[in-house]
Structures are given as structure tokens and as C-alpha cells.
């Protein structure tokens, strides 16, 4: 499986993703600068975390206009896989590839922590390696990670089963106590209707090696590779 990791000015998690896809999983991976407009040959486009363009105006608001985002859009429209992590999730919402928006955290403070997530779906290429309802632990690091959408959009997300991960307590209880940033419906990650575009605020690439305290995130990347092998 071939990965393309998008790099904007201000991205700072691109190398972390490459360490997982190329270093740990031995998958072909290339870094794609924001001025490029061609993703031909890649299977998965990754928009990593960081502070694209310094988060000026709004997180992801400038990055959405980069030439590479036109290539990402074409890739998604062809059914190609796209994942946005943290700032990448913000970019995807700004670009209209995912509904809703990421706004200031409930307490108006930057949150850096390890949080529990409940896996809501396991029928997508991203999550085959998880069990339905499984509680996993991933790191978060964001100041604007509170997911917001109008009630009609939230209802559609629930009806179409587009919520992939929810913040929860370690025992799986979904409530305000287990919600680190005030996201509506405790949404930590969601997909488009087709399931090929995924956005999530937690960082799976930072939980891909036991030496760093956990490997729950690695299974997301392993799911992708396994899905590709199953097709072959």
C-alpha cells in the first residue's frame, strides 16, 4: 500500500506518520509538498497534524487553498483513501470533505493528554483490526478540537453511522466526564458517507510503538495494509 503524506508549512507530525508507515510497517511512503498537485499512484493520502500556515485565520483555513488539496479532493472523489489527523481533520472540514467544524476546546485551553476512545465501527478499511465497541487509548494535543455541527448534520451523522470514534471513560461510558474538549456527541473521529475519508483529532501515529506507551494507533495503519492485501 502506497502512502502520500502531505506537508504544509507548519506541519510537524508528518515524520511521525512516515515512521509508522515506512519504518514500522515497511510500506512505500512519500512526502508531498503543499505546492504539488498530483497524487497519482498513491493509495492513502495522509494530512498530518501540526499548525498548517501557523493556524492563521482559523486552523486549516489557509491550507484548504493549497494546490495539493485539489489533488486530495480528486483522490477522494475517485474513492481513494484520505485521513486527516488533528490539524488534518481541521483541514478536511475547512475543505468541505467532511461536515462540521472544529472549534475552541470547551475550557478554552490547549489539551495534551492520553484519552479513551470507543470504536463505533469496524466495517471500514481503517478499523478492521479493532473489535466493535472496543475502548482504545490514543494521545490528543489540540486547542481547537471541539467538534461542532448543527443538529440536522449531527442527526445525519448518527443515522448514516459516520461516527467512527467517540471520546469515553476507560470503562466505555460515553458522557461529559470522558469528553476532553466538549465535542458534540463526544465525536473524536468521523468519516464521509462512503467511508473513504476519515478525520480524527487523536493521534494514532503517536501510539504505534510500545516504547512510547501504547500501540493502539498502529492497528489503524495495520488495518489499511491488511485491507489492501485482502483485495490482492
Curated annotation (Swiss-Prot):
Compartments in which it is found: Cytoplasm
Pathway as given in its UniProt record:
Purine metabolism; IMP biosynthesis via de novo pathway; 5-amino-1-(5-phospho-D-ribosyl)imidazole from N(2)-formyl-N(1)-(5-phospho-D-ribosyl)glycinamide: step 1/2
- The organism's place on the tree of life at top rank: Bacteria
GO MF term set: ATP binding; glutaminase activity; phosphoribosylformylglycinamidine synthase activity
Catalytic residues (UniProt): 86 (nucleophile), 203, 205
The segment(s) forming the Glutamine amidotransferase type-1 domain are 3-232
Return the InterPro entries for the record.
Class_I_gatase-like, PRibForGlyAmidine_synth_PurQ
Q: Give the SMART domains listed for this entry.
A: GATase_5
Among its keywords, does the record have tRNA processing? no
GO cellular component annotations of the record = cytoplasm
Q: Which reaction does it catalyse?
A: N(2)-formyl-N(1)-(5-phospho-beta-D-ribosyl)glycinamide + L-glutamine + ATP + H2O = 2-formamido-N(1)-(5-O-phospho-beta-D-ribosyl)acetamidine + L-glutamate + ADP + phosphate + H(+); L-glutamine + H2O = L-glutamate + NH4(+)
Q: EC number(s) on record?
A: 6.3.5.3, 3.5.1.2
**What Gene3D superfamilies does the record tag this protein with?**
3.40.50.880
Q: What is its main location?
A: cytoplasm
Keywords of the record:
ATP-binding, Cytoplasm, Glutamine amidotransferase, Hydrolase, Ligase, Nucleotide-binding, Purine biosynthesis
Could you tell me the Gene Ontology terms of the biological process aspect for this record? Answer: 'de novo' IMP biosynthetic process
Q: Name one Pfam family in it.
A: GATase_5
Subunit note: Part of the FGAM synthase complex composed of 1 PurL, 1 PurQ and 2 PurS subunits.
UniProt function note: Part of the phosphoribosylformylglycinamidine synthase complex involved in the purines biosynthetic pathway. Catalyzes the ATP-dependent conversion of formylglycinamide ribonucleotide (FGAR) and glutamine to yield formylglycinamidine ribonucleotide (FGAM) and glutamate. The FGAM synthase complex is composed of three subunits. PurQ produces an ammonia molecule by converting glutamine to glutamate. PurL transfers the ammonia molecule to FGAR to form FGAM in an ATP-dependent manner.
Name-wise, this protein is Phosphoribosylformylglycinamidine synthase subunit PurQ
Q: Which organism is it from?
A: Gloeobacter violaceus (strain ATCC 29082 / PCC 7421)
Taxonomy of origin reads: Bacteria, Bacillati, Cyanobacteriota, Cyanophyceae, Gloeobacterales
